[in-house]
């Protein structure tokens, strides 16, 4: 199923009922968080994700997203993706902004880009199940903790996102927008900067990707420099009756050859840094920026809880109420903390 909730329900049913008809499944971060401590997934520490290859993967992602409470790594990342910042260079040049490296730079660009009628400095995907990514990104940039809504960094992040609305730097029209709608507006020149996953294929297809058009930009440092990585990971159903064959397949997926094949077949950036170094061409516009992300920023998996989709939706609903002025920041923080505790 392509619908997020339906897909997760189907895979939950397969795993929770001990269905032996499926051996290996590829799951996203939301499902990894929901499943990793249930016993439904086979641990891979001694068979696949062994010490000799672990350092080639993003350690923060492995620890945050696919390691169970008892220390078992339950997945093999299929690719490496970042929630990158993308800018429209034409707009940067038009408004005379040369860099967006700090909070002050970011504000200056948003303000300048928003001066043109019908254009906003910042564009988002603020539909209730999508905006979670941006809330968490700003919380990290302001030095907060997504699980602790008494943290001052969290408050600063939410205040800033509301400030963007109040100053006309972003639009409440995007409250229903998912990535498809956001990207179309970005391509059309309606936004100056967005946060988005992937390598920009949508922009390339529209003829709008390039150093002088839309391109990836290093995430600015506010209180700290931080970025999220994501993946879909291959996991082994603990009820599988074909585990030896599955181990053979998963070892290949985790190997240099498997990661290279995944890149060549699916155009997904390799999860292994050593493979990325050798198979991704030097003229690939993403390669240098991904290396910069890995070397200069804190890299984490996204903050998620076992009741993942419920948590994401609840936080999105609260956020929409807050930016529309329906609840106060204090109310948001109190209810956000309740959501954290209720969905653990």
Residue ranges, per PLM feature:
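Hydrophobic residues within well-ordered alpha-helices
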Residues: 11, 106, 113, 136, ...
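Extracytoplasmic/periplasmic substrate-recognition and gating elements
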Residues: 72, 94, 166-169, 206-269, ...
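Extracytoplasmic "Venus flytrap"/periplasmic binding protein-like
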Residues: 1-60, 94-101, 185, 190-193, ...
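Glycine-centered hinge/linker elements that transmit conformational signals in sensory
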Residues: 110-113, 147-175, 219
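Beta->alpha turn/N-cap motifs
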Residues: 27-31, 179, 196-202
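Long, aromatic- and glycine/proline-rich binding clefts that accommodate carbohydrate-like moieties
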Residues: 65-66, 214-217, 264-317, 321
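Hinge/lid segment of periplasmic solute-binding proteins
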Residues: 28-83, 107, 115-117, 134, ...
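A local structural motif
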Residues: 1-2, 17-21, 96-98, 163-177, ...
